Regions:
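Terminal amphipathic alpha-helical/low-complexity segments used for targeting or macromolecular assembly
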Residues: 1-67
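Flexible, glycine/small-residue-enriched loop-and-beta-strand segment within the central core
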Residues: 49-123
Length: 123
């Protein structure tokens, strides 16, 4: 869990550095839906890995309702993700996003049609 807290801090700090509209880290924490989606995802992913799948999915659905960004709790997201203008973003269950990535509105890392194994792209 401590790793998740550190990653959340790095996400907020990264947004401050990349987005000239951000005033400070508190501005990002309270007012950026892209940050909120990442925050909810990191919590849901942690719970998903502990096999609390239902609670993890519930958290991801709440995040989607509030942010318009859908991230499956099984998706693996690296450090310092920046989601800018994130409406309509979908990140699937087996998607992997590396460190230092930026994603803009309308991006879908969706399924390939396979029923099993790796179904979503890597970034």
């Amino acid at each position: 869990m401590f790793k998740a807290i550190k990653d959340i801090y790095l996400d907020a700090k990264n947004i401050c550095q990349k987005d000239p509209a951000s005033k400070n880290i508190l501005y990002v924490i309270f007012l950026y839906p892209g940050f909120h989606a990442i925050l909810f995802h990191r919590i849901a992913h942690f719970l998903n890995n502990l096999n609390f799948k239902f609670i993890a999915r519930l958290i991801s659905q709440i995040a989607r309702f509030f942010t318009g960004i859908e991230i499956h709790p099984g998706a693996k997201i690296g450090k310092r993700l920046f989601i800018d203008h994130g409406m309509g973003i979908v990140i699937g269950e087996t998607a992997t996003i590396g460190n230092n990535c930026t994603i803009y509105h309308g991006v879908t890392l969706g399924g390939t049609g396979k029923d099993k194994y790796k179904r979503h792209p890597d970034l």
